[in-house]
Amino acid sequence: MTFSVKSPILGFEGIKNVEITKIDDFFVKMQDKDGDTSFTMINPYSLRNYEFDIPTYYQDLMQISDKSELQVYNMLVISSPIEESSVNFMAPIVCNTTNMTLSQVILDPVNYPQYSQAEKISTLLKKK
């Protein structure tokens, strides 16, 4: 699926269009359509209870309504073994599959103290 990036991906502000490809039930690959940059992301719901409110700014930017179909992913920093990889829960990638738009939503740490920028998968697996 190809998405138009409506809010820049931190550190990769030049990326305007991405292709998201499912790897398996847990992981997806996000590839810059106009370059060589790619990211591995994870379905956060496979690891933990993960809830947040999408700020109005992003809702307007992505034209999110009650009827919008959304998917949420989190960026991974891959390590070996995979359980040592870290997940950024503070900046989810929100995909509106209704209009094929995407934004990286930056969460306020004051409102979401339970999430961090670099939480190891192994820590999350122990909590389950």
Swiss-Prot record:
GO terms for cellular component: cytoplasm. Keywords: Bacterial flagellum biogenesis, Chaperone, Cytoplasm, Translation regulation. One of its GO terms (biological process) is bacterial-type flagellum assembly. Its main location: cytoplasm. It is found in: Cytoplasm. Pfam families: FliW. The keyword Iron-sulfur does not apply. InterPro entries: Flagellar_assembly_factor_FliW (IPR003775), Flagellar_assmbl_FliW_dom_sf (IPR024046). It comes from the Bacteria. Acts as an anti-CsrA protein, binds CsrA and prevents it from repressing translation of its target genes, one of which is flagellin. Binds to flagellin and participates in the assembly of the flagellum. Interacts with translational regulator CsrA and flagellin(s). Belongs to the FliW family. This is Flagellar assembly factor FliW. It comes from Campylobacter fetus subsp. fetus (strain 82-40). The lineage of its organism: Bacteria, Pseudomonadati, Campylobacterota, Epsilonproteobacteria, Campylobacterales. The gene is fliW.
